[in-house]
Amino acid sequence: MAGVLLTGFEPFDGETVNPSWEVVKQLDGTMIAGQPVIARQLPCVFGEALSVLYAAIEDLQPRLVIAVGQAGGRVDISVERVAINVDDARIPDNKGQQPVDTPIVDGGPAAWFSTLPIKAIVSALRDRGIPASVSQTAGTFVCNHVMYGLLHKLQEQAGVRGGFIHIPWLPAQAAAHPGEPSMATATVREALETAIAVALRQSVDSKLGGGATH
């Protein structure tokens, strides 16, 4: 077991790019903390995204898996705490599927928590001057679908940790959405490199505040 599996998504909802893949693909083949990084693109499609992810996990046998997704409108790097066992799509996926109140895993737990050191990652990012926070919801679209499915899968992969990170739009995307926040590719790349390094060296999270009042 070795290496880091890093995933990003194809564009969706009318966008021509997805910042998660634009950044993740730059890290493919790099070394971080002595571990090779392998990037894979996931389709923005319920079910299919997990099929591609599971195949990559079986093929690569990574020690760490971090899925990355676009969260247009968010102002910072959002390190997700929890995924819930429901698909409730406000918009269709890239194959026109729009499940409503559908379990991701029939009979599965209501939620799975990230096994990344989420607060340590946020602290390290802030120390580098990168806006970051712990997020309490990954939504109910394909990102949450992938996060829940990933963590469910990892229950049978002893010693493998994983989680999900949401990132803002790129500046070029935000230009088409006046008033919306963005983050430069180079900053997001540094954030992901930092998150991977922290996750590789720290298996137990730091005891830091990171909750929300609402």
Curated annotation (Swiss-Prot):
InterPro entries named in the record: Peptidase_C15 (IPR000816), Peptidase_C15-like (IPR016125), Peptidase_C15-like_sf (IPR036440), PGP-I_bact-type (IPR029762), PGPEP1_Cys_AS (IPR033694), PGPEP1_Glu_AS (IPR033693)
Active site: E80, C143, H166
GO MF term set: pyroglutamyl-peptidase activity
Compartments where found: Cytoplasm
Main location: cytoplasm
GO cellular component labels: cytosol
Protein name from the UniProt record: Pyrrolidone-carboxylate peptidase
Organism: Klebsiella pneumoniae (strain 342)
Organism lineage string: Bacteria, Pseudomonadati, Pseudomonadota, Gammaproteobacteria, Enterobacterales
